């Protein structure tokens, strides 16, 4: 239903078995995307709540009365439908293998009347066969085991009967239950997610290879459109959270690899040398840092290399002639054709990014191969993401000597005027729908660009008969009507 999709993140939170810890990045006004700052971590507590504490997360599944479970879940959110909660709860109790494991554990604990038992969800116990594409769901006995002693793998999930003041346990990103415990709405049967034990398959024979399947390979597969129903692609805001969660997981595994392989990356001697030179310290007091190589996207050395590449162009060809920004249009016909009925572009970040990448390649072909701005001596571009989620690209172009733009020809190339509809109806439609800032101003005080009662971008711009440039910022030709 529309109400379910509108509040799908809240419905998932009502049934999730682990907590979702993050610092969400919010902006004033309308925010169609889910953004976080820093790390994401999933945590899980004890099987039973302490004393008079309210049951949370997996503890709610141990409540015997089904209606009391519904009441507890509904009490955390004001905008959920109790009938929908009851229906989803019934499905999970019937189909979800983790819920079945919890119910079995509750029966055993009730019979033995002890607080010394732990429910171990193994990280290394693998289901028979293959994964979700071919895997058979293992039975509950293969999923978890009640153990009285603390004998477990360091990646196992240990659910103690009661916490007795112990802190919440953080779920390892490589655990096969990482996704199923957090997203029961997306994985109602409790199917396994990615783990380091997964191997790639030979597409011709279907046999397992010796190569490990990376998190990126696994989640790329999960996000692709298939001939069968994929609940991920219909989950709207929950898909955004899922994609962000998995990207952070991929980055975490990459950082872990770099931390564990510093010696093979020849970082130790570099680290010690830098510490000694900067701090003028003795060898006994020098600490050890983790070196992120230039191959890690977003690291200081990666940025430094990109900057040096750009400066090399400037040293060779001088200042760039054109600075162009291309922004993704959420109303792009290709995007509308690819998304499902009832969806908005922000519901499918995968489609938006793929379409934008195609447009970037087409733009590159027009500028480099077809020389629409003139013959280029050099060019580069950078892709960024706006706060509201849409990607955009910044281009720097160096024109050849014969195609350089002179000051007296600028107004023939660019201006800030609305074209006449009678002369070019297509251009008029593009400019009026995609190239006009706002609305903002005193009548729209909650607009994202409004700061201290005025537009932070300087709109509306003053009328100008000719383009002028002050301190590197142009005021484009915009004649008074």
Regions found by a protein language model. Name each.
Residues 1-481:
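Non-catalytic interaction regions
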């Amino acid at each position: 239903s529309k109400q379910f999709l509108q509040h799908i993140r809240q419905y998932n939170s009502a049934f999730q078995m682990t907590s979702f810890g993050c610092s969400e990045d919010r902006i004033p006004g309308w925010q169609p995307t889910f953004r976080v700052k820093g790390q994401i971590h999933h945590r899980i507590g004890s099987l039973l709540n302490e004393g008079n504490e309210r049951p949370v997360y997996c503890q709610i599944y141990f409540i015997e009365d089904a209606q009391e479970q519904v009441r507890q879940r509904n009490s955390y959110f004001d905008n959920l439908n109790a009938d929908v909660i009851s229906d989803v709860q019934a499905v999970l109790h019937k189909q979800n293998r983790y819920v079945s494991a919890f119910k079995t554990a509750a029966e055993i604990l009730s019979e033995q009347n002890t607080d010394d038992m732990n429910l171990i969800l193994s990280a290394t116990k693998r289901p028979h066969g293959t994964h979700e594409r071919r895997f058979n769901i293992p039975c509950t006995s293969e999923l978890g085991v009640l153990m009285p002693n603390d004998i477990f793998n360091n990646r196992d999930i240990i659910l103690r009967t009661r916490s007795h003041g112990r802190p919440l346990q953080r779920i390892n990103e490589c655990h096969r239950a990482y996704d199923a415990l957090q997203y029961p709405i997306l994985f109602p049967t409790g199917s396994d997610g990615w783990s380091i034990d997964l191997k790639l398959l030979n597409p011709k024979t279907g046999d397992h290879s010796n190569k490990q399947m990376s998190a990126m390979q696994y989640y790329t597969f999960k996000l692709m459109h298939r001939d069968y129903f994929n609940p991920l692609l219909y989950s709207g805001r929950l898909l955004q959270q899922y994609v962000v969660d998995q990207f952070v997981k991929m980055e975490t595994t990459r950082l872990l690899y770099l931390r564990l392989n510093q010696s093979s990356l020849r970082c130790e001697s570099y680290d010690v040398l830098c510490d000694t030179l900067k701090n003028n310290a003795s060898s006994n007091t020098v600490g050890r840092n983790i070196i992120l190589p230039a191959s890690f996207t977003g690291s200081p050395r990666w940025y430094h290399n990109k900057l040096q590449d750009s400066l090399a162009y400037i040293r060779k060809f001088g200042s760039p002639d054109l600075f162009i920004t291309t922004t993704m249009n959420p109303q792009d016909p290709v995007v509308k054709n690819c998304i499902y009925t009832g969806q908005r572009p922000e519901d499918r970040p995968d489609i938006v990014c793929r379409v934008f990448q195609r447009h970037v390649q087409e733009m590159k072909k027009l500028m480099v191969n077809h020389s629409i701005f003139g013959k280029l001596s050099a060019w580069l571009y950078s892709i960024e993401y706006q706060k509201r989620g849409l990607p955009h690209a910044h281009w720097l172009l160096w024109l050849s000597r014969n195609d350089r733009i002179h000051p007296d020809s600028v107004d023939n190339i660019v201006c800030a005027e609305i074209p006449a509809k009678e002369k070019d109806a297509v251009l008029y439609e593009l400019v009026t729908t995609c190239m006009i800032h706002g609305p903002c101003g005193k009548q729209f005080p909650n607009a994202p660009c409004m700061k201290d009662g005025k537009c932070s971008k300087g709109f509306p711009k003053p009328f100008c008969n000719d383009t002028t440039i002050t301190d590197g910022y142009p005021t484009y030709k915009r004649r008074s009507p």
